[in-house]
Amino acid sequence: MTILPKKKPPPPDADPANEPPPPGPLPPAPRRGAGVGVGGGGTGVGGGERDRDSGVVGARPRASPPPQGPLPGPPGALHRWALAVPPGAVAGPRPQQASPPPCGGPGGPGGGPGDALGATTAGVGAAGVVVGVGGTVGVGGCCSGPGHSKRRRQAPGVGAVGGASPEREEVGAGYNSEDEYEAAAARIEAMDPATVEQQEHWFEKALRDKKGFIIKQMKEDGACLFRAVADQVYGDQDMHEVVRKHCMDYLMKNADYFSNYVTEDFTTYINRKRKNNCHGNHIEMQAMAEMYNRPVEVYQYSTEPINTFHGIHQNEDEPIRVSYHRNIHYNSVVNPNKATIGVGLGLPSFKPGFAEQSLMKNAIKTSEESWIEQQMLEDKKRATDWEATNEAIEEQVARESYLQWLRDQEKQARQVRGPSQPRKASATCSSATAAASSGLEEWTSRSPRQRSSASSPEHPELHAELGIKPPSPGTVLALAKPPSPCAPGTSSQFSAGGDRATSPLVSLYPALECRALIQQMSPSAFGLNDWDDDEILASVLAVSQQEYLDSMKKNKVHREPPPDKS
């Protein structure tokens, strides 16, 4: 078999469709063609390929993803983007699908502008016909958008007869997202910041007003897709590493199915995707939809999802919602009125939002108990203040009552003495009463409770038990005064001679008997337990001294005989 030399690359303005097909056979067999790719990728067909319609030799650019759903054609047909194989042709490997291909619905955008529907190519050679099945579809790079395919950068020349050139092989064998970063950066630079901001604001407002959804911003570090899914499943975007690890493990366990959608080596693809800064695409979305058994809805500047990925089993679980911004970044779309955290983790008897409701009930119960305890404490404080106020009022009433009783006793004593009482004795009694009143006021101010309990007229039981009347101030002073050394056996305190019957103390003996009786009583009955002994003695001695001097003067007057005038 003769191998012709490579054909020189045509100039950029040349039309490949007008070039005549070169003579010679095609290579006997291409390298393994990857299946219809959803994660973005090249055709993956090794040798030169011929388009039956155009007659152009060379690799075809990637095509958009096929629509999901029933396709026209007889039963058993591969897909509408696969052409019929001529009789006698040898068909290439056919992907075995275990679940629906991870692609959008018929209504979703299938590819970017200028993308054409892919088709299998048939090359006719001298030794036979070889068909390579699987012109793969690119849906974006590591952060490629949903439904947007990215064309692979190709060499200036087109593959010639006899197989692809080394330059072509080097460019065509790249991984699915080789043009992600340069193309995304170029698109972002070409956008007007004001327009982008206005569009983002409209998108967020439309979702909130029409659907009630809220867009949660994810960190732009290359793991935005996994962060958005982690926020939906675990409620914490920082668990994106766990989501990525589970997703990659799931892809490896189902490599026989997902490898048909990747043009590069599947192990190399998985190892690259395990890096935390590598973005995700539709392959990972389909894997996570199956892994968590929840649909994945993608929103892009619309209130309706532009793409939905379904799991193997249909259920009523809330879908995982993500939003796609500027063709390079994913955010999480949450429904604040319906809890979805924990759904899809396989937890038995798990009810979304039940934990929050339980915590809320416990918080309300604790708050109510704390409020009740606080109110009880306030009630106790108010009751204590009320009791203290009542006690103060009672003490004040008792004090005023006792002072009034003292005034009444003094008034009665004045009425009993009558106008014949000497002024000096009246002054002495008044001074004694004033001293007693001042002493009593001082005593009541120091110990009102004990005074009221012992000497107040509110306690008649004590006086009735002892068989005595409440002592008057004069009587108290008289009892405390020691007997006068000059008093013979009978003496008068306030008047002399004929006024003995009107005196409170007629003789010393009743006073001594009363004094002995009082000494047998407890001092607390008179409220004397809080008095200072020195002050009492000083007051009593002063009054006694004054009365003693007065009595001495009176006795001297009575004893001196009148001078004999004869």
Curated annotation (Swiss-Prot):
It comes from the Eukaryota. PROSITE patterns: OTU. Phosphorylation at Ser-177 is required for deubiquitinating activity. Phosphorylation at Ser-323, Ser-332 and Ser-503 by MTOR promotes its activity. Inhibited by N-ethyl-maleimide (NEM). GO terms for biological process: CD8-positive, alpha-beta T cell differentiation; negative regulation of interleukin-17 production; neural crest cell differentiation; proteasome-mediated ubiquitin-dependent protein catabolic process; protein deubiquitination; protein K48-linked deubiquitination; protein K63-linked deubiquitination; regulation of protein stability. The modification Phosphothreonine is found at residues 195, 502. InterPro entries: OTU_dom, Papain-like_cys_pep_sf, Peptidase_C85-like. Residues 273-283 are annotated as: Variable-loop. Residues 324-329 are annotated as: His-loop. Interacts with TRAF3. It comes from Mus musculus. Residues 213-336 form the OTU domain. Disruption phenotype: Mutant mice die at the embryo stage. Residues 34-47, 105-115 have a biased composition (Gly residues). GO terms for molecular function: cysteine-type deubiquitinase activity; deubiquitinase activity; K48-linked deubiquitinase activity; K63-linked deubiquitinase activity. The gene is Otud5. Keywords: Hydrolase, Nucleus, Phosphoprotein, Protease, Thiol protease, Ubl conjugation pathway. Residues 1-117, 145-175, 413-499 are annotated as: Disordered. Residues 218-224 are annotated as: Cys-loop. GO terms for cellular component: nucleus. Belongs to the peptidase C85 family. This is OTU domain-containing protein 5. Pfam families: OTU (PF02338). Residues 11-30, 63-75 have a biased composition (Pro residues). Signal peptide: none annotated. Its EC number is 3.4.19.12. The modification Phosphotyrosine is found at residue 175. The active site is at residues 221, 224, 329.
